[in-house]
């Protein structure tokens, strides 16, 4: 099965077939079609190595055999705590093809959360990416006061000699341990017995308001809701072969969709980094043609580029500003034509300024060859989308949820920053009570693992998933995300405020990494701001602001004046009740490993208030 280049009706017909298929079936079909073509590339010892589809399938079968030899059986779980790697993909799919259930643990998780997820998933075998990840597994067991795992496989085993644990083996030892004839017969039997409605894996929720819950998908649900769903919300990913970089955590649904499942039925070749390699370095080497990132990544790269330009000489600053202005005009023209494809030869002036000023900057970032781009996982400021579109990157926002898969994207490739979203085949999106998004159709999750009460609470009487997201709906059936239902604030003046909209306006500043809005039951809104230290430090050097460390920098009068200006600039785009009256800078960089945020850096609002209650109270005491 290959949907790349197919007309949309034919691609959707293939999607219907996915709903009746299993991962091992689709994998085997892919191998039969393109056995000698590259499945993915991974960097090792400074060199990119290729794995063909035939070799990929063989290594996945080898991993499955090794799991069986260690007693794993269909329906049982394995856990993986690691950064993206070839071994991660192979281990996860090795479990999937025999009907076992893998789940990822974010490498940034604190030891307490690792212990919780090991218990919730009841994993028998765990894979650790390196020494740091292995230490988290062992610390989790110490916190739990019990041995939670039967076997531990260490992917990067350079420090294995430090440990004296009989459960611990290297990945190479693991791969060489399942070759008996009895195991091979068992492997073939279990592959044949997997059905489309068997669980394929768990994806744990972010845990912003409580303990994470393990959402589980069936084989069909995963491939339709997250795999094919990603092609629906990013149609340009389906139109031609693409080169992508693998950087999203594979514990996340979006990361799994792009790295594990989309390549099974679309011409997407992923490129995995060497251990410890930065995303910027990887992009420079790979020069991807499509890039999917969370808002934080798009904002960070844009902010760093902007500060570099502002720190340059007068001539370059003005030339870049002129090129950017031309880019804004061009993007506006493209947005006015449905599904417009840029044709540079008809825009000679823009092309000249683009090649002279913008293209070199994008080339240095590794983004000069990107023809398709999307942001997902959280709201992204409209100004960030506008900036990237002015730079020639057709960035747009996509929407999905852990429980409902990929649900919506703008109708056009070059979309307005706040363009309404249209529902994705084969799901239906409707308005529920209070404007909550209700999702139904193919590709919805099957429930929360061993939590029937939470599962029942997530579905309404019509079998629709209650996403918890509030939206505004148009007469044409499209919708705009407003905020999480649980996060809506009501001021003492009875005004309903969506914090995400205000926070998004504040995070449009290159100096703001995170914003947290308060004001429920109060007369006005206040904000805690996490500074983007790297960008702020560049600004300080350019403006001769002296400091000795983080604390002295954020307390500097010039910095406070800068943030006052940034907040006022954000307020200019907000209605009066939404404007921020007071703010404070968070006196540290938020760290997921210390529990400041979720592992994906989502804000835990109650926890944030508890940590910085004195700052919030101070902003209201000054009234």
Predicted regions and their residues:
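Conserved AMP-binding A3 loop
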Residues: 50-54, 200-226
């Amino acid at each position: 099965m290959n949907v790349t280049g197919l007309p949309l009706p034919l691609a959707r017909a293939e999607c219907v077939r996915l709903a009746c298929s299993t991962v091992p079936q689709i994998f085997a079909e892919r191998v039969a079609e393109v056995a000698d073509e590259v499945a993915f590339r991974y960097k090792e010892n400074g060199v990119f190595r290729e794995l063909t589809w035939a070799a990929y399938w063989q290594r996945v079968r080898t991993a499955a055999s090794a799991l069986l030899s260690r007693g794993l059986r269909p329906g049982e779980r394995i856990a993986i705590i690691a950064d993206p790697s070839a071994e991660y993909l192979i281990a996860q799919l090795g479990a999937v093809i025999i009907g076992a259930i893998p789940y990822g643990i974010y490498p940034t998780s604190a030891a307490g959360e690792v212990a919780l997820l090991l218990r919730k998933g009841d994993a028998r075998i765990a894979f650790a990416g390196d020494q740091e990840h292995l230490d988290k597994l062992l610390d989790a067991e110490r916190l739990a006061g019990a041995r939670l795992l039967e076997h531990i496989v260490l992917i990067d085993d350079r420090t294995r000699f430090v440990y004296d644990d009989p459960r611990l083996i290297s990945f190479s030892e693991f791969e060489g341990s399942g070759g008996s004839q009895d195991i091979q017969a068992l492997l073939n039997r279990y592959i044949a017995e997997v059905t489309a409605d068997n669980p394929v894996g768990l994806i744990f929720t972010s845990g912003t308001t409580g303990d994470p819950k393990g959402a589980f998908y069936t084989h069909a649900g995963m491939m339709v809701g997250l795999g094919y769903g990603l092609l629906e919300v990013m149609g340009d990913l389906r139109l031609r072969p693409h080169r992508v970089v693998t950087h999203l955590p594979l514990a996340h649904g979006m990361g799994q969709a792009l790295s594990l499942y989309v390549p099974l039925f679309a011409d997407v070749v992923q490129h995995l980094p060497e251990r410890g390699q930065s995303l910027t370095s990887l992009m420079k080497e790979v020069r991807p043609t499509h890039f999917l990132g969370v808002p934080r990544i798009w904002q960070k790269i844009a902010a760093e580029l902007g500060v570099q330009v502002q720190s340059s000489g007068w001539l370059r600053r003005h030339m870049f500003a002129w090129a950017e202005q031309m880019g804004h005009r061009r993007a506006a023209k493209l947005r006015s034509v449905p599904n417009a494809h840029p044709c540079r030869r008809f825009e000679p002036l823009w092309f000249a300024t683009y090649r002279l000023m913008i293209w070199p900057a994008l080339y240095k970032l590794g983004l000069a060859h990107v023809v398709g781009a999307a942001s997902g996982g959280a709201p992204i400021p409209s100004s960030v989308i506008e900036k990237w579109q002015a730079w020639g990157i057709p960035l747009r926002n996509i929407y999905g949820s852990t429980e409902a898969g990929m649900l919506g994207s703008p109708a056009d490739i070059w979309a307005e920053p706040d363009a309404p979203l249209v529902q994705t085949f084969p799901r239906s999106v409707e308005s529920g009570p209070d404007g909550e998004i209700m999702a139904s159709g193919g590709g919805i999750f099957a429930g929360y693992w061993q939590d029937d009460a939470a599962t029942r609470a997530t579905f309404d009487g019509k079998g629709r998933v209650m996403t918890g997201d509030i939206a505004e709906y148009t007469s044409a059936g499209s919708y705009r995300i407003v905020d999480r239902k649980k996060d809506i604030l009501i001021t003492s003046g009875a005004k309903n405020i969506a914090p995400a909209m205000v926070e998004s306006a504040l995070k449009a500043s290159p100096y703001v990494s995170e914003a947290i809005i308060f004001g429920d039951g109060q007369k006005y809104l206040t904000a805690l701001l996490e500074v983007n230290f790297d960008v702020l430090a560049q600004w300080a050097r350019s403006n001769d602001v002296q400091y000795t460390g983080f604390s002295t920098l954020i307390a500097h009068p010039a910095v406070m004046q800068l943030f006052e200006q940034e907040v006022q600039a954000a307020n200019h785009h907000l209605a009066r009740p939404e404007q921020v009256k007071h703010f404070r800078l968070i006196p540290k960089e938020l760290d997921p490993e210390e529990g400041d945020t979720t592992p994906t850096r989502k804000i835990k609002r109650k926890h944030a208030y508890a940590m910085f209650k004195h700052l919030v109270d101070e902003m209201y005491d000054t009234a």
